[in-house]
Every structure is written in C-alpha cells, then in structure tokens.
Amino acid sequence: AIYNDYGGLGFKDESIKMANALGNKQHMILANHGIITTGETVAEGFNSLYYFEKAAETYITALSTNKELNIVSHEIAEKTSEEAANYPVDTAKQFLSEIRCILDKEEPDYVN
C-alpha cells in the first residue's frame, strides 16, 4: 500500500486512516516518510522489512545501470509471493535467530 495522506503523528484519527489504507497488506510506504511492515510475529515483521529493503536496494542498483530492466510479470511475482508464504520452514524465525546470534557476538549492547 502507498499512503499519501499524511495528516500528522499517528495518533487516533491518523492511525485509523493508516490502518484502513494498509488493509490486509504487509507493507505500506508512507510518502516522504518511510515504510511500515507487519507480521504475525516480530520475526515475520523483521523478515518482511529486511527483504523489502533488499529488494529496494537491488532495484535502485539496477536503475543506476541505465539499462533496460527485465521485470518479471505480475503473475510470476504473485506465484513467487505465494510460494514464499507457504514455504514449509519458518525461515523468518530462523533468520531472526541467526541475526541475534551475530549481534550477540559483534554488538552485545543492542539488548540495552
């Protein structure tokens, strides 16, 4: 979802408008602000944000080549999204666990 109707801090009225705009989607880009990601768990939310950022980074890098992009069809994108959502292993939980292990070793102050 894309949210262009920023009306101030996300207190009651604004948060209701934002929630309605998000609907059942996992991501919402807030115009001139940033992104909101959701998930049923913290791991899913983190995973969603991480891969959204990676996709955006890859897209910007591809654009910087000034070459024609070979973008997959909407059907293939939907199929891939469904396959990832139905993957039999909880990769989001595993990924967050591994990130925390790295942080525990390299940046232990993150817990404070």
Locations of regions flagged by a protein language model:
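Class I SAM-dependent methyltransferase SAM-binding "motif I" and its flanking Rossmann-like core
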Residues: 1-9, 14
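Short, conserved beta-strand edge motifs with alternating hydrophobic and charged residues
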Residues: 3, 29-33
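Hydrophobic N-terminal alpha-helices or hydrophobic patches in metabolic proteins across all domains
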Residues: 4-7, 24, 43
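A general structural signal for well-ordered alpha-helical packing
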Residues: 15, 19, 46-49
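Crotonase-fold acyl-CoA enzyme core
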Residues: 16-30
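A conserved C-terminal secondary-structure "cap"
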Residues: 26, 34-112
